[in-house]
Structure formats: C-alpha cells, structure tokens
Amino acid sequence: MSAGAGTGARRLFAGGYTDGSGRDGISTIAFDVGRGAARVVRTDGCAPNPTYLARRGSFLYAAHELDECGRMASYAIAADGSLACRGACTAPFDAGTCFVLPDPNGRSLYGANYLSGSVGCCALLEDGRLVAGLPSRRHEGRGLRDDRQEAPHVHSLSFVPGTRLLAAVDLGIDALVIYQVDASGAIAPDPVETVQVPAGSGPRMVAYHPRLPIAALVNELACDVLVFRIGEGGLQWRIVEQLALPQTPGGDALAAHVAFAPDGRQLYASVRGSDRLVVFHVDERGSVGGRCDVPSGGKGPRHFSLSPDGRFLAVANLASDDVCLFARDAADGAVRAVAHVRVPQVACVVWDA
C-alpha cells in the first residue's frame, strides 16, 4: 500500500497532541480511493505530542512538542505501515519543537523550537539514528503583539530550492531568517539575510513554487499570504503580492498552512476560525489570484498536505479531531470532500510516498 497507488488503497500518517493521555500519537491511516473511505489501522510513537511529521525515503521524522526540552525522533516505516523508533535527539536548552525538516542530503535533521525561539540540529545516520552535537541557533527580539510576540517563536523551516540556505520562519519577530548550511549540516552562526514582514503579521509557514523563483508565506496573525519573488542564489526576497484570507465576523481567524500544487498551477491555504480551505490560481509567470474557498471538512484546519500526484488533499482539523480527505480536480484545482476519519487532537498529516 502506498500513496502512489492508482485507484486502490493509499496510506497516510497523522500526528498530534497526546497531552499526557499515555496513548501513542502517530496514526497510520488507510484511504480506500475506490470506496471513498478512510480508517486508522494502527498507532505508534515513542514520545508525547508528535505534532509535526516529515517523510524522507523509508523514514518518518517527528517533532515532539514538549515544554521542557527540544525533541526530534526518527521512525523506520515497515511495509505494513508500522513504525519502529530508531532514536531521538533531545536538546535540554531548547523547547517546544513544532516542526522538523530532514536535510535533502540525508545527513542532518533540523527542528523549529517555538518556545525557545531557536533552530535545532542533529546528525542523521543512514540507519535513521539521530546524533546530538551540532549547535542550535537562537533568535532575539520581539514583535508588535504582547500576547503572541513577546519573544522569538520559530515556527517552521525550509531549504530554499537549489541552495544550501535554511529559512527559519519566526512568528515572534515577524521575520524569515536565512542561514547558510555547510556540507556537514552545521548552521552558520549568523544569518545571510533577514526578511522582515509587516509588524504584527506573525509569519508561520512558507511554500515554494515547483518551477518558478516564487515563495508564499502564510501569516497566522494577519491572516494573509505574502508572495515573494526570490533573487539569484536564493536571496533578495521581494514582496510582490499580498493575498487576503477569509476572516471571521469577529476578525479573529488564524491562518495556518500553505502549499503549492505539485504542478504549480494552484496555491492552497488553510484558515482556522473561518475553517476554510482556500484555493488561488497561479499563472505561468507566477502571479497569484482568483481566490475561491470551501469548508475544511471540520474545525481548526491546522495543517494539510497534497498527495505527490496531486489527486488528493488531506486536512488535519485539530479542533474537531478529524482528518478530511478531498479529491482534487487536476484541471482547475477544485477540491471535493470524499472521506473523514477520526484522529484525536490531530495536528499534521502526510502521505506515505
């Protein structure tokens, strides 16, 4: 079973909060495409609160969101979808790991530490084991809002395509901080560029167009998306568009996630509060517009992911404890809900392929 199967069964992994419940937090989901049905077939995990997952090859990596330390773990994926923990990397001076990113070269694993406002790093061995020792990078400063931006809060990480530049999105200081990473995986002490966004925006996640030098940054607090054109070598980011997202009557909606379709023809974003999945159209030059939106299939769409072939989209609705699966029209990017599955306190969902 895999996410690449045509009309048969596909597999997904969902992670979330366990909050001292004692249960494992990573669920394996079987999605029957033909019947339009999904079910949880097992749960695994070796630490609480695996709130973000990333897959690379035959391994699944998890950010375990803990108040007392930073923690990332590695799991080997078996043929039946079961997970075997290969080890974990704990950083006592970091806290609140909410995002994990494997290096494309397979040698390092990076974590965004929300509570400590830092970027963590550990070495990654071929068998999936993690080795601590690479230094983390800690941000300084604060933002406009006392309730959410009293300190740095690194929320996500990404490699700028075609480079060894690591981009850290910091909600607390309204910035995207870009570091050079060497061949060993070590992060340079000082950033090579800091991209500031409007005060109070609260940036959360960034996505890259699959072909064009375009990036989309979703701002949680401003509830909008900023589209950037990236200069040569992955630097000199320049805002070219600002896209509004659906608000609530009280104006308290929080944007959550953003991703381009695999073919680059659509840009998707999710919004909590209004509980919408938003679709923008992207032209051949990278201009974004033509917004439409649909219900997320639940409440609190914290995260979503598109299947590698672009045929399906899965949404993790944290506030309603479910994953909603959508079929996607390849022609216009429109999505249609086809299945639901209950996953308690789900925060992230990824496809197994």
Language-model features and meaning:
Residues 83-156:
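Asp-box/WD-like beta-propeller blade repeats and closely related beta-sheet repeat scaffolds
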Residues 17-19, 65-67, 114, 124, ...:
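Short loop/turn segments immediately following the C-termini of beta-strands
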Residues 29-36, 75-82, 121-131, 179-187, ...:
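Short loop/turn segments immediately following beta-strands, especially the blade-tip
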Residues 2-4, 47-57, 92-104, 140-163, ...:
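Beta-rich, blade/repeat-based domains predominating
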Residues 40-106:
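Blade-loop segments of beta-propeller domains
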Residues 39-45, 85-91, 135, 141-147, ...:
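A short beta-strand motif characteristic of beta-propeller blades
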Residues 318-324, 336-353:
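Blade-level signature of beta-propeller repeat domains, shared across WD40, Kelch, NHL, RCC1
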